[in-house]
Amino acid sequence: KTNTGGEGSKHGIWHEAIPDVLQRAEWAGLAVSGLHMHIGSGADLNHLATVADSLERTARDIGRSLTMISAGGGLPVPYQEGEHRADMSEYFKLWDTTRKRLEDSFGHRIRLEIEPGRYLTAEAGILVTEVRAMKRQGSKKYLLVDAGFHTLARPVLYGSYHPMSLCPTSTTPPHELEAVAIGGPLCE
């Protein structure tokens, strides 16, 4: 499973290593000009406020050489009923307020970058696949389709939910609804 953040991730620099990184940058004659934080793609503004405070504290540790802050990790996309869209105006206001406080503190302009991630494209397409076979294996019924994780990797990589709809090919009334497993042509 892909791990894009936290202590065990291959990405970025864990916050406890920042003092060492700053010391190395100074030794090499480099000024740290940007700070990027991978925040995850949650819509919980209370959590984001905590993350913004953490970014601001780290920015102050870096100091006046900083000219850019970046909130990465993407914006949330609702896939299931009950999930909410991000309140974009509140999301921006939170990060812009952080940026302005840093500008006031440092006395120069701070650029704000926001990484939208899959937010821009997640709802831009539809995968259409065809049920090629039905099969019972023990107590489970499988619908075998002509698309697999090579076509739609997110559920396999992240264990994420992906909505599906069935489009009947006949006008015959459907049978009772039942839970089925969907399988593709690969050994997923």
Where are these regions (language model features)?
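Short glycine/threonine-rich loop-to-helix capping motif typified by GTGT followed
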Residues: 44-51, 79-91, 121-133
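Generic alpha-helical secondary structure signal
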Residues: 15, 83, 95, 162-165
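Broad hydrophobic/π-residue packing in well-ordered secondary structure
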Residues: 7, 11, 47-49, 68, ...
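Active-site beta-loop-alpha junctions enriched in small/polar residues
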Residues: 37-42, 69-76, 80-82, 117-119, ...
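Nucleotide-activated donor-binding/catalytic signature segment of Leloir-type glycosyltransferases, i.e.
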Residues: 106
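Charged (often Lys/Glu-rich) extended helix/loop segments that serve as interaction or gating elements
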Residues: 109-188
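Active-site-proximal beta-alpha core segment in soluble small-molecule metabolic enzymes
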Residues: 1-70, 77, 94, 98-103, ...
